């Protein structure tokens, strides 16, 4: 009987020890889990962006990163005017995320067997037809005229050709297109010829209007596009290496959250954002940047909305020239989060 009493007294003590061990085990597991999350969150995300609308939407995140106010840890590459600058770093793994033209994203995807994914759309159409007179009121008014343009062999050319054809103008014989090496060359023609007509991207079109008296936007090609198509012109997207997405999902989600907020800041606080844009050398002067922001169609589309816009636009580019998108239309795994 005494032995039974002694055993009964031991049982509560054993239960207490077991409960303590269980609590310690759960606590250690929780600590380990937190450690993994912290490690993922603290990975340095290497980001590249083109100097233009894509970078204009990223300036608040860039500034927050500099000030140590960003949630993620970022390393921003030097801004570039040449989108091909980021091709090799992306394929080699030297950059994790980059803002690039939508068709270039497709080309990289095809050339790397799915090595990148689109995270979001960041820029819609940025092309404008500009002139110093008032001879152009619609696309049809370009028939028989000479047009100076930039972007040969890239999305500006394919977008222009499609719009012209849908408006009954043969892009090869219905007008004369003189392709310029860059916007500076196109601007020189406008400055020296009062009757010159040009296709310029934003924010350079706005900058040109500050340099050439009487220069005006005759046509926003976004408007001309939506008159003939259901999808948008998708100029720019942000992509990530597929391996990086798999290895650091939390870092990708954090970047997207902060990037979306940065884009909203640019659109909602144009004056303050313009100061940052000028400070990073994207546009020479803040007043010009402030005027250009509403015309740059800086946006943030993700998920199904992103896929619908990008896939529709890529299909039209493919129909114009299959090589413009890398030869084939990307599969569904091209689109992050779907």
Put a short name on every predicted segment.
Residues 1-44:
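Short, low-complexity disordered leader/linker segments with a strong preference
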Residues 40-169, 177-179, 196, 202, ...:
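Short, glycine-/small- and polar/acidic-enriched structural segments
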Residues 45-46, 95, 145-150, 189-195, ...:
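Second-shell loop/turn segments in exported
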Residues 60-61, 127-136, 232-251, 302:
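A bilobed periplasmic-binding-protein/Venus flytrap-type ligand-binding module shared by bacterial periplasmic
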Residues 66-73, 223-231, 298-307:
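Short, solvent-exposed loop/beta-turn-alpha elements that line the ligand-binding surface or hinge
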Residues 103-104, 184-277:
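Pocket-lining segment of extracytoplasmic ligand-binding domains
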Residues 245-320:
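Secondary-structure end/capping motifs
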Residues 311-338:
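Conserved C-terminal helix/tail region of periplasmic/extracytoplasmic solute-binding proteins
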């Amino acid at each position: 009987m005494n032995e039974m009493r002694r055993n009964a007294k031991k049982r509560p003590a054993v239960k207490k020890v077991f409960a303590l061990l269980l609590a310690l085990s759960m606590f250690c597991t929780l600590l380990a889990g937190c450690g993994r999350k912290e490690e993922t969150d603290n990975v340095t995300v290497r980001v590249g962006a083109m100097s233009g609308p894509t970078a204009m939407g990223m300036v608040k995140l860039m500034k927050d990163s500099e000030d140590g106010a960003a949630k993620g840890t970022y390393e921003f590459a030097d801004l570039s005017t040449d989108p091909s600058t980021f091709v090799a770093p992306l394929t080699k793994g030297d950059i994790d995320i980059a803002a690039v033209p939508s068709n270039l994203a497709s080309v990289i995807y095809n050339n790397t067997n799915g090595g990148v994914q689109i995270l979001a759309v960041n820029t819609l159409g940025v092309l404008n037809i500009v002139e110093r007179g008032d001879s152009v009121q619609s696309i049809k008014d370009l028939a028989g005229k000479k047009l100076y343009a930039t972007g040969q062999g890239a999305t500006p050319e394919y977008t222009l050709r499609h719009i012209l054809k849908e408006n009954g103008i043969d892009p090869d014989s219905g007008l004369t297109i003189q392709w310029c090496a860059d916007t500076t060359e196109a601007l020189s023609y406008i400055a020296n010829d009062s009757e010159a007509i040009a296709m310029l991207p934003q924010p350079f079109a706005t900058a040109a209007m500050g340099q050439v008296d009487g220069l005006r936007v005759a046509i926003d090609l976004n408007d001309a596009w939506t008159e003939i198509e259901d999808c948008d012109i998708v100029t720019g997207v942000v992509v990530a290496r597929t391996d990086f997405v798999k290895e650091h999902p939390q870092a990708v989600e954090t970047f997207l959250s902060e990037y979306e907020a940065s884009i909203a800041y640019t659109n909602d606080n144009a004056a303050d954002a313009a100061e940052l844009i000028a400070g990073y050398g994207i546009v020479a002067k803040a007043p010009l940047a402030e005027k250009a922001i509403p015309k740059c169609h800086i946006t943030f589309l993700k998920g199904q909305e992103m896929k619908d816009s990008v896939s529709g636009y890529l299909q039209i580019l493919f129909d114009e020239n299959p090589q413009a998108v890398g030869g084939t239309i990307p599969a569904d795994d091209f689109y992050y989060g779907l």
